[in-house]
């Protein structure tokens, strides 16, 4: 008790220092208290009562500096998460704490099996996994004074271990696409764990592709899941479609953009999707594909013999192999609509874009004559 109490002095000093140095922008920085206190590896004995006391004392110390600071927790993972979230919210209610937001972590991997330096396991059913988040949201909203406060997923990924090779695969990319289509339903934000593979929680990795958490392998080599996020970033506009297989939007300029995926554990093989857009005229269809043979540096590294260290030339090659396959074609409207059909390989992600073709060719220019040699 004395240790926690005395640490409040340092918390207040730190916040005042940050305010002095960076100004009131600091007030927009959410303050999350601790990390996974429901695990004994991060909080001694996973002692819930001690964590709740820490949370209350920290919240009060922060608010004493400036009541505009936003404070939240409990930053739990999926272990006994229902019990922890219920008890956390009850504690905040009973003590009339001015809780600003709620946080938790989200992983979707069965208990892994260790084999040498690596861990392997099955990805859970996405919809079943997402129910965990709805349960947390419902618990929060069952307290009238906290109903509707933001819920942030401050960590999410498939496996919760940084030695799970699934992280490096196109299967991971397709699975994460499936999650991204729904994670915004009950959460204010969701943060993928992590950006890069420079991570030493279990020691220094043995190989360039070792199942690290990151979107990017060491050496700035994008993994397939990097492109899932890059593709979703392009989806800004009016939502036209959101399903288990695709998301599409109409942009302000009239173009259409979307992401489609094929999660093999749900489809069992390749799949085909057809999108119909009511319109007239000629359109350009652009696709960027991530699958087993495109934007998959893991396969190239494997085919090269899985070298444990990379020369500069190999690193360059793997970066080059990490780019999606880009294709374009022209589509003409028939009967008042344009139809785009995508064939998706198992465990693939495809970005697609439909843009109206406008303008005329320069005088005398013929693409057909150029490519046919006439």
Identify the function of each model-found stretch.
Residues 1-5, 10:
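Single conserved hydrophobic/aromatic residue that forms the stacking wall/gate
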Residues 16-26, 91-98:
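Acidic (Asp/Glu)-rich catalytic clusters
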Residues 29-36, 154:
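Short, conserved phosphate-binding/catalytic loop or strand-edge motifs used
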Residues 48-182, 186-188, 207:
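Noncatalytic carbohydrate-binding groove/subsite architecture in carbohydrate-active enzymes
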Residues 152-271:
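Aromatic/acidic polysaccharide-binding cleft in carbohydrate-active enzymes
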Residues 243-303, 343-355, 361:
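Carbohydrate-binding surface patches
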Residues 279-340, 363:
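Acidic, Ser/Thr/Pro-rich beta/coil linker or hinge segments at domain junctions
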Residues 357-374:
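Terminal connector regions
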């Amino acid at each position: 008790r004395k240790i926690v109490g005395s640490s409040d002095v340092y918390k207040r000093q730190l916040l005042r220092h940050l305010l002095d140095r960076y100004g009131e922008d600091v007030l927009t920085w959410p303050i999350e208290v601790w990390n996974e206190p429901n695990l004994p590896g991060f909080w001694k004995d996973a002692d819930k009562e001690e964590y709740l006391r820490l949370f209350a004392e920290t919240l009060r110390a922060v608010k004493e500096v400036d009541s505009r600071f936003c404070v939240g927790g409990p930053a739990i993972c999926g272990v006994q998460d229902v019990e922890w979230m219920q008890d956390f919210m009850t504690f905040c209610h009973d003590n009339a704490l001015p809780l600003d937001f709620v946080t938790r972590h989200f992983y979707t991997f069965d208990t892994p099996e260790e084999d040498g330096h690596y861990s392997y396991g099955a990805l859970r059913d996405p919809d079943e996994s997402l129910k965990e988040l709805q349960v947390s949201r419902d618990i929060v909203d069952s307290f009238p004074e906290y109903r509707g406060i933001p819920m942030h997923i401050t960590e999410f990924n498939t496996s919760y271990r940084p030695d799970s090779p699934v992280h490096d695969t196109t299967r991971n990319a397709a699975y994460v696409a499936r999650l991204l289509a729904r994670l915004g339903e009950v959460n204010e934000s969701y943060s993928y764990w992590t950006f890069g593979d420079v991570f030493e929680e279990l020691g220094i990795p043995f190989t360039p592709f070792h199942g690290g958490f990151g979107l990017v392998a060491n050496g700035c080599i994008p993994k397939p899941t990097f492109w899932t996020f890059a593709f979703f970033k392009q989806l800004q506009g009016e939502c036209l479609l959101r399903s288990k297989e695709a998301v599409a939007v109409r942009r302000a300029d009239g173009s259409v953009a979307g992401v489609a995926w094929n999660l093999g554990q749900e489809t069992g093989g390749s799949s085909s999707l057809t999108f119909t857009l009511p319109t007239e005229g000629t359109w350009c269809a652009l696709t960027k594909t991530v699958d087993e043979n495109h934007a998959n540096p893991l396969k190239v590294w494997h085919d090269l013999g899985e070298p444990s260290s990379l020369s500069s030339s190999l690193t360059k090659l793997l970066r080059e192999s990490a780019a999606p396959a880009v294709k374009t074609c022209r589509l003409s409207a028939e009967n008042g609509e344009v139809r785009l059909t995508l064939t998706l390989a198992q465990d693939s992600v495809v970005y697609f874009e439909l843009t109206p073709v406008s303008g005329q060719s320069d005088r005398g220019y013929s693409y057909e004559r150029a490519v046919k040699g006439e």
